[in-house]
């Protein structure tokens, strides 16, 4: 499954060129021409990365990043700002607000792709790992594809990371706090019950192949991923 990239750019020629370059390099671009349409694209299947212009009809790129960071489902999506605002103070503001990289226009398409790949490697080091398989369930970190046999399964980026952690640490019980630290990281404040929400979503995503039974609740302790039902 190709990595989905949300391209938020109000200038049609630039947006179309960027989308063409992304498609040529194996990505799946999704377009948004203004602030509101970008917000409307924040749903499943979630974008793996967002290319974001600063100046947009209806709002700014900075406002959009703040919106992303407020929501638990989107705060981990990496953002690369692509803008004509090249002053040092603008770059600093963008990065401090939460952008993972900052590219000024005009830009080289090759550099754009290289920077996107660099951000994805930095944010998701699992992307260089091999396919993991357990009882007909397979997870490919490189393509972000999860399969139940030959059937593709759709899930959000947080559920994908949670499943990846479970499949690389099977048959062990983890508390909510441990899962938060391993999957969300220690520098992000998320309530313990957020784990329960994503566990439910992960189970729902695994239902078509019957693999939801592998995500097991251990009362009073936490969760375990097991092939023993």
UniProtKB/Swiss-Prot annotation:
Alphabetized GO MF terms: bacterial-type RNA polymerase holo enzyme binding; identical protein binding; phosphorelay response regulator activity; transcription cis-regulatory region binding
- Pfam entry (one): Response_reg
**Cross-referenced SUPFAM superfamilies, in alphabetical order?**
CheY-like (SSF52172)
- A GO CC term attached to the entry: cytosol
Q: Name one GO biological process term.
A: regulation of DNA-templated transcription initiation
Question: What domain of life does the native source organism fall in?
Answer: Bacteria
Which residue intervals define the domain Response regulatory in the entry? 4-120
The record, for InterPro entries, names: CheY-like_superfamily, OmpR/PhoB-type_DNA-bd, Sig_transdc_resp-reg_PhoB, Sig_transdc_resp-reg_receiver, WalR-like, WH-like_DNA-bd_sf
Chief location category: cytoplasm
In which residue ranges does the UniProt entry place its DNA-binding region annotation? 129-227
The answer on whether this UniProt entry bears the keyword Transport reads yes
Q: How is it modified after translation?
A: Phosphorylated by PhoR or CreC.
Localization in the cell: Cytoplasm
**4-aspartylphosphate is carried by which residues?**
53
Please give the Gene3D superfamilies that the UniProt record associates with this protein: 3.40.50.2300, 6.10.250.690, Winged helix-like DNA-binding domain superfamily/Winged helix DNA-binding domain
* Keywords recorded for this protein, A-Z: Activator, Cytoplasm, DNA-binding, Phosphate transport, Phosphoprotein, Transcription, Transcription regulation, Transport, Two-component regulatory system
Q: Does the keyword Transport apply?
A: yes
What does the record give as the function of this protein?
This protein is a positive regulator for the phosphate regulon. Transcription of this operon is positively regulated by PhoB and PhoR when phosphate is limited.
UniProt-recorded name of the protein: Phosphate regulon transcriptional regulatory protein PhoB
Supply the source organism's classification.
Bacteria, Pseudomonadati, Pseudomonadota, Gammaproteobacteria, Enterobacterales
């Amino acid at each position: 499954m190709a990595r989905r990239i949300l391209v938020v750019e109000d200038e049609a020629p630039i947006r179309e060129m960027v989308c063409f370059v992304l498609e040529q390099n194996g990505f799946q671009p999704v377009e948004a021409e203004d602030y509101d349409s970008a917000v409307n694209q924040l749903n499943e299947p979630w974008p793996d990365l967002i290319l974001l212009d600063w100046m947009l009809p209806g709002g700014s790129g900075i406002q959009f990043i703040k919106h992303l960071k407020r929501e638990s489902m989107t705060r981990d999506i990496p953002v690369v700002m692509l803008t004509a605002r090249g002053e040092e103070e603008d770059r600093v503001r963008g990065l401090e607000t939460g952008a993972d990289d900052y590219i000024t226009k005009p830009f080289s398409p090759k550099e754009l792709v290289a920077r996107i790949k660099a951000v994805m490697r930095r944010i998701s080091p699992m992307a260089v790992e091999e396919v993991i398989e357990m009882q007909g369930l397979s997870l490919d970190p490189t393509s972000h594809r999860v399969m139940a046999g030959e059937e593709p399964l759709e899930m959000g980026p947080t559920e994908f990371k949670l499943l990846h952690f479970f499949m690389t640490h099977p048959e062990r019980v983890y508390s909510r706090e441990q899962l938060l630290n391993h999957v969300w990281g220690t520098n992000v404040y998320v309530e313990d019950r957020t784990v329960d929400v994503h566990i439910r979503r992960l189970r729902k995503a695994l239902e078509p192949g019957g693999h939801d039974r592998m995500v097991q609740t251990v009362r009073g302790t936490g969760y375990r991923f097991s092939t023993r039902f």
